[in-house]
Regions:
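Bacterial N-terminal signal peptides that target proteins for export
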Residues: 2-12
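A domain-start/cap signature at the N-terminus of enzymes
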Residues: 27-97, 112-115, 128, 188-212, ...
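Short, proline-enriched alpha-helix->beta-strand connector loops that line the catalytic pocket
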Residues: 226-231, 265
Length: 293
């Protein structure tokens, strides 16, 4: 990999789940299709988050660990997000920030559920703040929400919702209430949320140090990052919703999705953008999964 400078160093990783014969992660244990079905089943059983005892729209600085719910207006639309401030947080000591985005048809509550992703528990162990924004939803409950990640997905794309502007505004507002290390802001997401994480790497490269996309490829319509951003793609070979080799996956509403960019093409784009060397290095190789850097 080509090194530019310590401040401009960027990393590109591709983790591929090649089969369901072994595991190095939860995703490796099932095919992508069955994994999504399990997520839908859980969503049907429970829609709440683990953010018990939320404080809604607190004014001023946040000084105590806990769970917080916020609303803000952007482009004339009321947007919502959940914030978890970890037990290790100390005012005056800037903490890293993770923006975690739900998949298409999901919600911030579902993404925040520790039963589903464990991000709140991880936040408490590692000491980073995690924020769960909600996409655009046709329902007051915020369920069935989508992100405008470029060519996907659903109502957010069709209405050309400014999700990039919302995320920037959310981070700016949050940084006024908690002490965030602006050099350690990261994004991750599942499926449509993963696609959105990649768009943030393109459009908010001045904000994000690194992004990780699970089951989401690069479906941006334009991408001109002002600096390298480390990118991680985690994808199943047999994903039948966002196919590894690109194209349309299985869905009940074809018009809600797109012809997805393949994983190899997505990786190739970021190799060029980040000035990485053309030959990948295998850094993980286990039954069922491998990772190239």
């Amino acid at each position: 990999m080509k090194r530019m400078s310590a401040s401009r160093f960027a990393l590109l990783l591709l983790m591929v789940i090649v089969a369901s014969t072994g595991s190095v992660s939860a995703l490796a244990q099932d095919s992508a299709g069955s994994f999504r079905e399990r997520l839908r089943a859980r969503m049907a059983q429970k829609g709440g988050s683990d953010a018990a005892g939320e404080i809604v729209n607190p004014a001023g600085k946040i000084t105590q660990p806990g769970n917080y719910r916020f609303t803000l207006e952007h482009d004339g639309i009321e947007r919502t997000y959940l914030v978890h401030v970890p037990a290790k947080y100390q005012p005056g000591h800037p903490a890293p920030l993770l923006v975690a985005m739900h998949g298409g048809g999901g919600s911030m509550e579902y993404q925040a559920s520790d039963d589903n992703y464990g991000q709140i528990s991880k936040s408490d162990r590692e000491g980073f703040i995690v924020v769960f924004p909600n996409g655009i939803s046709p329902l007051k409950s915020g369920l069935l929400a989508t992100w405008n990640a470029g060519t996907c997905c659903g109502p957010a794309r069709d209405r050309n919702i400014d999700d990039v502007g919302f995320i920037r505004k959310m981070i700016d507002k949050l940084s006024q209430q908690v002490d965030i290390d602006r050099q350690k802001i990261f994004a991750t997401g599942m499926s449509n949320g993963g696609l959105m994480a990649i768009r943030l790497a393109c459009d908010l490269s001045d904000v994000f140090k690194a992004v990780a996309s699970v089951a989401g490829t690069d479906n941006t319509t334009h991408c001109n990052p002002t600096r390298p951003v480390s990118v991680l793609f985690i994808h199943a070979r047999n994903d039948d919703h966002v196919p590894f080799e690109g194209g349309r996956g299985k869905t009940r509403r074809q018009e809600a999705v797109t012809s997805f960019t393949s994983v190899p093409e997505s990786v190739s784009r970021w190799v060029k953008r980040n000035g990485c060397g053309p030959e990948p290095k295998r850094v993980l190789d286990k039954p069922g999964a491998y990772c190239d850097r």
